[in-house]
Amino acid sequence: MPLINLPEFSAELLSEFDARKAERIDTPVIQPAEPFLDIAGEDLRRRIFMTESETGASLCLRPEFTIPVCLRHIETATGTPKRYAYLGEVFRQRRDGANEFYQAGIEDLGDINIPSADARAIGDATGILARLLPGRRLSVTLGDQAVFEAVVQALGLPLGWQKRLIHAFGNMTQLEALLAGLVSPQFVTGLDDDIARLIAAGDEQALIAHIEQEMQATGYSTNASRSPPEIARRLKEKLVLSETRLDDAAFHVLEEFLSLHVPLVNASAALAGFADAAGLKLGNALSRFNGRVGALADAGVDLSCLDYRAAFGRPLDYYTGLVFEVTAEGSSAVLAGGGRFDRLLTFLGATDRIPAVGFSFWLDRIETERAAA
């Protein structure tokens, strides 16, 4: 179906994609809802337009392109490396602006040279924007979830707390609430006395048997709710997490890390200095970060317009490393955003691990910037 009401610069944009050897791909507007509900993140989940098929399968209007492009790649059993380009409508409930709008972007799948692919994504996003917005100086904010994960792991927190903090990365309100809970734990109350005793005794089999007995007695079906072993595991994890306290020194280390905001050219030294002062070994995460900075310089990207902010993330749960957003200098409107999503294709059903990075353009915002020039 032909697209209508496309921005007037669409032909120029598609020409830029062609010049970067990205193959144009189309994906259905109606998508299976499950992948988005499972891994797209709370911010996107609450904006999705849901529907269902005649058979009751949950469907949605396409809210973004990364997951559909990855699903299409898996369905067609296409080899890698592969670069895809897309331009089409997405549908999201928004407070401001239309609920349907155009996005375009590139997904770069299967390039095992991670620093080079990351640098290419940032270089392509800024390079194309520079062509569409001649004379406008751009500003890029860059974060790295892998570095945050390395800091959290090096502090030796329980795995459950690590998962919670990593899941909240990029959402400072949620992250601050979790850190407050670590500093001043709220102990679990209201547990059944028998359950509390079995958890304290560490008798997992007896705990599972007790939960199963209670479920049968109260008429809960394991088909309609969590299984007894899963409930037991979650109860134990909840109790462990509630009893974990982050000491003041570790709390201040996390605070100091999250406050880092420096020009990218100074970021490697700032991270190394932070790790040394805190006594943390960040190993591969730092070397990968440094490799990306070097690759950006080698690719000719103007590093003077790039900032590193340690607390910066994007509200999509599938990112695993690099995340970035591009604005016009002096404006808060995000014109392009992207990052690395190395686990996404495996989660969606790919048999092999496929490293991936990509970015998308907000065409309505670019159109506004062009009109204001």
UniProtKB/Swiss-Prot annotation:
It comes from the Bacteria. The keyword Ribosomal protein does not apply. It is found in: Cytoplasm. Pathway: Amino-acid biosynthesis; L-histidine biosynthesis; L-histidine from 5-phospho-alpha-D-ribose 1-diphosphate: step 1/9. One of its GO terms (biological process) is histidyl-tRNA aminoacylation. GO terms for molecular function: histidine-tRNA ligase activity. The keyword Cytoplasm applies. It holds the Pfam family tRNA-synt_His. One of its GO terms (cellular component) is cytoplasm. Its main location: cytoplasm. Keywords: Amino-acid biosynthesis, Cytoplasm, Histidine biosynthesis. Belongs to the class-II aminoacyl-tRNA synthetase family. HisZ subfamily. Heteromultimer composed of HisG and HisZ subunits. This function is generally fulfilled by the C-terminal part of HisG, which is missing in some bacteria such as this one. Required for the first step of histidine biosynthesis. May allow the feedback regulation of ATP phosphoribosyltransferase activity by histidine. This is ATP phosphoribosyltransferase regulatory subunit. It comes from Rhizobium etli (strain CIAT 652).
